[in-house]
Each structure stands twice: as structure tokens, then as C-alpha cells.
From Swiss-Prot:
It is found in: Nucleus matrix; Cytoplasm, Cytoskeleton. GO terms for molecular function: actin filament binding. It comes from Mus musculus (Mouse). This is Cofilin-2. The modification Phosphoserine is found at S3. InterPro entries: ADF-H, ADF-H/Gelsolin-like_dom_sf, ADF/Cofilin.
Length: 166
């Protein structure tokens, strides 16, 4: 069921910037987004980038010790969100980086919010071409342990996420 919600151009720009890893200067790399949240506009007609709800690559090791834990803390406890998380992980064979699309729909969110976010999910997913991993999360217990994301990324072959062993 489509909700008629549209995706703001800035959301698509953020996605494309996160997806394309062109060779960049050190300054450009620091400005790359590691994680970003998207929400519905106040009038519930557009999916927009949520202001100040992001982690930049340059923040890691500076103001952000562990990007995964910091990302989980950005999620609102009582409302839904969409998120992109640029996961850096290691398998038994190699290091990898993949974008993960996350639909955050906690049990404590209002029913109306869960319904409009669920019915608008396809609109944003269609704009995020090439995403390999999608994850619907219904509460902190599902997301606070990084090993759950490790399983989504590659099951038992994933040995670490963001430099931390699983």
C-alpha cells in the first residue's frame, strides 16, 4: 500500500554520496556520512534527512568512539525512522563495506506512525538502488548487539564489525 509520500532530493543526494566511494582527499573522506537518519516531514508528505542525526567518518576516533553504538543511540525510542548505515566489517576472507538500509519501527511507536512509515518504505527503497542489506528493527533488543547486524551482513563468516570482534 503506497502512502503518497515522496522522497526529498536531499535524501537521494545523501544516498548517492554514501554509495559512491570515489577517491577523495582526506578532508572529503572526513565529511562522508557513516550513518544518517531519515524521517517524515512535519506534514507527513515527504521523507527528509533528519537534521543533526548523522555520524561523519571524521567523527570516528574524535567525538565518536564506536560508530555502531553511537548510531544506535541516535534512534528515537518512541518513533519510527529510516536509516542508512555504512557498515565496515571483516569476514574470515576479507574486509568489506556495505550500506545497510534500516527500517526502525519500535514497538513503543504510535500505531499511526508505524503505519505511515511502513506504507512509505517502498518509496525510499526504490530510490536506494543497489542496497544489498535491508533490516527491519522493532526494538533496542534487536539492534543493540552488533552481532545481530553481523548475521545480517554474512552470517557466521563475519568476525568483526567496526573493528570490534563479534
Amino acid at each position: 500500500m503506497a502512502s503518497g509520500v515522496t522522497v526529498n532530493d536531499e535524501v537521494i543526494k545523501v544516498f548517492n554520496d554514501m554509495k559512491v566511494r570515489k577517491s577523495s582527499t582526506q578532508e572529503e573522506i572526513k565529511k562522508r556520512k557513516k550513518a544518517v537518519l531519515f524521517c517524515l516531514s512535519d506534514d507527513k508528505r515527504q521523507i527528509i534527512v533528519e537534521e543533526a542525526k548523522q555520524i561523519l567518518v571524521g567523527d570516528i576516533g574524535d567525538t565518536v568512539e564506536d560508530p555502531y553504538t553511537s548510531f544506535v543511540k541516535l534512534l528515537p525510542l518512541n518513533d519510527c525512522r529510516y536509516a542508512l548505515y555504512d557498515a565496515t566489517y571483516e569476514t574470515k576472507e576479507s574486509k568489506k563495506e556495505d550500506l545497510v538500509f534500516i527500517f526502525w519501527a519500535p514497538e513503543s511507536a504510535p500505531l499511526k506512525s508505524k503505519m505511515i512509515y511502513a506504507s512509505s518504505k517502498d518509496a525510499i527503497k526504490k530510490k536506494f538502488t543497489g542496497i544489498k542489506h535491508e533490516w527491519q528493527v522493532n526494538g533496542l533488543d534487536d539492534i543493540k548487539d552488533r552481532s545481530t547486524l553481523g548475521e545480517k551482513l554474512g552470517g557466521s563468516v563475519v568476525v568483526s564489525l567496526e573493528g570490534k570482534p563479534l
